[in-house]
C-alpha cells in the first residue's frame, strides 16, 4: 500500500459501489485517503473496504459508533480486523464507552486504526444544541467532550476547523480530523462551521475531509490536485 503524502481525506459519499469506485479510480492514493460513511457501507458492507485497500487507499471508516460500551468496542474491533486506517465513535457515548474501545484496540497484536472521537457535528449550531437540551455554544460542548476523549486515551477528534485552534491548545497530543472543508469558491452545502483547506491546517487540523468539491467536480483528479496546490505541500 502506498503511504498517503497529504492530509486530505476524500469522502466517498455515494449510494452504490460502482459510483464510489468510479471516483476512487480517478484519485491517487498517494495524494489522499478515502472515507467510507454510513450510506456506502450500508449498501456494500465490508467488501467496499477491502476493494479500496486493494487499490492502495487507506480507509477512514466513518460510522460514528454510539452504543453501550461492549457493543461499541466489538464494532471497533471488527473495523480493525477489516484493516481500516481510522475509525470513529461518538464522544457523547461517554468515558466508559470510549475507554472500552481503546482497550480492545490495545489488546490487538497487529496494526491498530486511529481511534477518533466525534464531538459536535459540523451541521449543528447553538439552536440545534438547545433543541436537544444543551443550552451552550458548540465550542463549549466540543471542549467538554474533548476532555473526555483525552481521558479515555483516544487518538484524536473529529471537529470543526473553527474549534481546532482551541482544541490544539488544550489537547496538543490529539490529532484533529476536520470535515466541512470547502476550497475557496465552493458552495457551503449543509456544512455550517467551515474553513478553507489552508485555513484549517493553519488553525491546527491534522486531516481534512473533503467531499462534494472533489467528488462532484467535472474533473475530480484536477480538483484534488488543486487542493494539494492550495495547501502548498
Curated annotation (Swiss-Prot):
GO biological process: 'de novo' pyrimidine nucleobase biosynthetic process; 'de novo' UMP biosynthetic process
Catalytic residue positions: 64
Keyword Zinc (UniProt): no
Protein name per Swiss-Prot or TrEMBL: Orotidine 5'-phosphate decarboxylase
Function (record text): Catalyzes the decarboxylation of orotidine 5'-monophosphate (OMP) to uridine 5'-monophosphate (UMP).
UniProt keyword terms in alphabetical order: Decarboxylase, Lyase, Pyrimidine biosynthesis
Entry GO MF terms: orotidine-5'-phosphate decarboxylase activity
Pfam families assigned: OMPdecase (PF00215)
Species: Pseudomonas fluorescens (strain ATCC BAA-477 / NRRL B-23932 / Pf-5)
Pathways per UniProt: Pyrimidine metabolism; UMP biosynthesis via de novo pathway; UMP from orotate: step 2/2
Amino acid at each position: 500500500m502506498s503511504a498517503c503524502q497529504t492530509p486530505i481525506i476524500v469522502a466517498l459519499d455515494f449510494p452504490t459501489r460502482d459510483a464510489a469506485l468510479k471516483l476512487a479510480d480517478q484519485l491517487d492514493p498517494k495524494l489522499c485517503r478515502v472515507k467510507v460513511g454510513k450510506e456506502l457501507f450500508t449498501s456494500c458492507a465490508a467488501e467496499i473496504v477491502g476493494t479500496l485497500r486493494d487499490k492502495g487507499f487507506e480507509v477512514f471508516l466513518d460510522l460514528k459508533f454510539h452504543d453501550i460500551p461492549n457493543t461499541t468496542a466489538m464494532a471497533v474491533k471488527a473495523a480493525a480486523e477489516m484493516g481500516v486506517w481510522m475509525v470513529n465513535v461518538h464522544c457523547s457515548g461517554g468515558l466508559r464507552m470510549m475507554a472500552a474501545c481503546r482497550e480492545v484496540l490495545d489488546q490487538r497484536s497487529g496494526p491498530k486504526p486511529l481511534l477518533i472521537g466525534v464531538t459536535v457535528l459540523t451541521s449543528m449550531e447553538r439552536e440545534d444544541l438547545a433543541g436537544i437540551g444543551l443550552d451552550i455554544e458548540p465550542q463549549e460542548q466540543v471542549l467538554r467532550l474533548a476532555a473526555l476523549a483525552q481521558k479515555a486515551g483516544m487518538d484524536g477528534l473529529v471537529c470543526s476547523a473553527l474549534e481546532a485552534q482551541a482544541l490544539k491548545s488544550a489537547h496538543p497530543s490529539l490529532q484533529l480530523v476536520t470535515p466541512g472543508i470547502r476550497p475557496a469558491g465552493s458552495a457551503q452545502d449543509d456544512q455550517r462551521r467551515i474553513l478553507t483547506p489552508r485555513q484549517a491546517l493553519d488553525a491546527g487540523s491534522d486531516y481534512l475531509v473533503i467531499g462534494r468539491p472533489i467528488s462532484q467536480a467535472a474533473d475530480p483528479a484536477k480538483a484534488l490536485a488543486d487542493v494539494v496546490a492550495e495547501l502548498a505541500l
